[in-house]
Amino acid sequence: MKIIARNKKALFDYSIIERFEAGIVLKGSEVVALRAGRANLKDSFVRIIKSEIFLLNSHISLLHTTHSFYKHEERGARKLLMHRKQIDKLLGKVSIEGYTIVALDLYFNTKNKVKATLALAKGKNLHDKRETLKKKQADLEARAAMKNYK
């Protein structure tokens, strides 16, 4: 499993409730750009529109070798492929309980298909983010102390 892009900001801003795997509909030029590692999920988000699920605002750069006929939209909406039951479950959670869906990463699976890891998440408050930073800092200091002890 080769990870193409990871959304680190989502892990900081949201507490992850549940993870899902989804296929993604891409054009040929987008797949070539992903193989070159030209993707960014920083500001991306997921929406359910007419019982179909889309990844919006994800950035896949154009390669300079791509012919103008085959060029894709860099920040276009990309359809995600999931089972109907999973989409309905996500729709119920998002509409009623105040959760959101975020894209965590893009990767090539063992069959060389591009997959996206989605997460059902709830936004963190400012004090939760501070607590996460404090915990991370304490873990780093503990590791450094253990390293120096040996």
Curated annotation (Swiss-Prot):
Keywords: Cytoplasm, RNA-binding. Its main location: cytoplasm. SUPFAM superfamilies: Small protein B (SmpB). InterPro entries: SmpB (IPR023620), SsrA-bd_prot (IPR000037). It comes from the Bacteria. The keyword Plastid does not apply. GO terms for molecular function: RNA binding. It is found in: Cytoplasm. Pfam families: SmpB. GO terms for biological process: trans-translation. GO terms for cellular component: cytosol. Required for rescue of stalled ribosomes mediated by trans-translation. Binds to transfer-messenger RNA (tmRNA), required for stable association of tmRNA with ribosomes. tmRNA and SmpB together mimic tRNA shape, replacing the anticodon stem-loop with SmpB. tmRNA is encoded by the ssrA gene; the 2 termini fold to resemble tRNA(Ala) and it encodes a 'tag peptide', a short internal open reading frame. During trans-translation Ala-aminoacylated tmRNA acts like a tRNA, entering the A-site of stalled ribosomes, displacing the stalled mRNA. Belongs to the SmpB family. This is SsrA-binding protein. It comes from Campylobacter jejuni subsp. doylei (strain ATCC BAA-1458 / RM4099 / 269.97). The gene is smpB.
